[in-house]
Amino acid sequence: MLKTIKIFSDGSCLGNPGPGGYSFIIQHLEYENISSSGFYLTTNNRMELMGIIVATESLKQPCCITISTDSQYVQKGILYWIKNWKTKGWKTSRKTYVKNVDLWLRLEKSLNLHQVTWKWIKSHSGNKKNEQCDHLARESAKFPTLKDFGYIL
């Protein structure tokens, strides 16, 4: 039987592009893992993706995961858009190149091991775990320690 895991995640960027951070909370039964990191120069969307990627990459065995995010970009991207992007050589419907391909590929790979359900949460709607992730992501953006090597101006 698969472990049932809840993941809450959020990303933040001060300036967009600018310093950014992500945070996630992983819950399993009474266990809770909270993590966050800050980057010197990145974007909000990259941080939204990174939070979920780092959380799911930390799971070493197949799990049944519910991922809660306030990012429609991430949720719609992985559920609806990615198949067309890949078919069209990573181009959008407007024939421009998809941004953050490096992270979309990492996200897709990190999810392959798991059974995943996506739950969209409206930003700042009072969901305590989402609010906690939002706060930690913003704080991490204020004190960056990492370089986002995949970010290209």
Swiss-Prot record:
Positions with a binding annotation for Mg(2+) 2: D10, D134
Gene that this sequence comes from: rnhA
UniProt-listed GO biological process terms: DNA replication, removal of RNA primer
Localization of this protein: Cytoplasm
Cofactor binding note: Binds 1 Mg(2+) ion per subunit. May bind a second metal ion at a regulatory site, or after substrate binding.
Organism the protein comes from: Buchnera aphidicola subsp. Baizongia pistaciae (strain Bp)
PANTHER family linked: RIBONUCLEASE H1
Requisite cofactors: Mg(2+)
Keyword Hydrolase carried by entry: yes
Primary location group: cytoplasm
Classification via NCBIfam families: PRK00203.1
Residues annotated as binding Mg(2+) 1: D10, E48, D70
Protein name: Ribonuclease H
